[in-house]
Amino acid sequence: MTTVGTALRPNATRVMLLGSGELGKEVALECQRLGVEVIAVDRYADAPAMQVAHRSHVIDMLDGAALAALIADEKPDFVVPEIEAIATDMLVELEKQGQHVVPTARAAKLTMDREGIRRLAAEELWVPTSDYRFADGYDAFQAAAEAIGFPCIVKPVMSSSGKGQSFIREASQLMAAWEYAQQGGRAGAGRVIVEGVVKFDFEITLLTISAVDGIHFCAPIGHRQEDGDYRESWQPQHMSELALQRARQVAEKVVTALGGHGLFGVELFVCGDEVVFSEVSPRPHDTGMVTLISQDVSEFALHVRAFLGLPVGAIRQYGPAASAVILPELDSDNVQYANLSAAVGAGLQLRLFGKPHIQGKRRLGVALATGLDIDEAVQRAVSAANGVKVSG
């Protein structure tokens, strides 16, 4: 039986968030709703989740010793990674000593880089993936690209939000793509993955929850990517029953192999009735922000419910809904938002993340909308997001 203590009391149930961005902020809010004490951690001060947590700390989360010292000091019941750039080897060691890592330290380690999860999916679980090769140096990268064939895609094995990623059409682009990949990795220059291009009709995120009452699925989420990062997402994404069945089979196989309880964002390519595995995040997914308006229980609430050991039960999806990001470009430590009235109303909601700094382009919020169909929902969300005026 799950029990929850009282925040800021000796019997408190404590959750430590490793990563305090917009996704972590929503997880923190859901923890707060259940009376859970929240400790938010990130590499910079005043991150979004820190603004709604009981306490916060600024550390280099890739520093294993610093991370272990903080966990020893705070003694959280649950360590909840919300980003990939964490000293996962230390999490594995702490888990062996009895620390609860969500969903598991192994899941955090395998999904920190593309190589771990790709080898698990393709070579151990035998789920369909794109053709791929890994390379450490330019010569090996060139050979990998030639073996895969053109066009192909190169990505650092450790990167996110499209950083360091290139679409290569011909051999003359290899050097530029290699240099860009070396700049985009979370840990600096290093290993890359070269992938063959998959012919697909659309991409989906299948939010998959592993809980005490089994495996659960949200309705599939479609999304549009630009520069390697999502711009709009919508739910439900229409697909054939056979494709949906296959997507669920792949997602369940991957999630079960990673283990633990929590929500996983499983990314898949869909072409007709066929599905191809792309990536998985063992945590809420940015495209899943649409669930803040599209479901009775958001992806963030589902994640918290699952890792606390509570049953998920049925998930109600309300109908066509969409999200669109607010992505301004400016330099400021004092951001201001205007024209907000156009972004709220019946079936129209706004989330501003409260990020304290922007330098260049940065996702600062999201507009959420419902509609009579997906096209209308997306149009309403995009219009609302574009209407928000950001200055600083």
UniProtKB/Swiss-Prot annotation:
Q: Quick one: which residues bind ATP?
A: 114, 155, 160-165, 195-198, 203
Which example biological process does GO assign this protein? 'de novo' IMP biosynthetic process
Q: Which SUPFAM superfamilies match?
A: Glutathione synthetase ATP-binding domain-like, PreATP-grasp domain, Rudiment single hybrid motif
Q: What is its EC number?
A: 6.3.1.21
Q: Which Pfam families match?
A: ATP-grasp (PF02222), PurT_C (PF21244), RS_preATP-grasp-like (PF22660)
Q: Where is the ATP-grasp domain?
A: 119-308
Its catalytic activity?
A: N(1)-(5-phospho-beta-D-ribosyl)glycinamide + formate + ATP = N(2)-formyl-N(1)-(5-phospho-beta-D-ribosyl)glycinamide + ADP + phosphate + H(+)
Instruction: Say if the entry is tagged with keyword Signal.
Output: no
Q: Where is the signal peptide?
A: none
Q: What is this protein called?
A: Formate-dependent phosphoribosylglycinamide formyltransferase
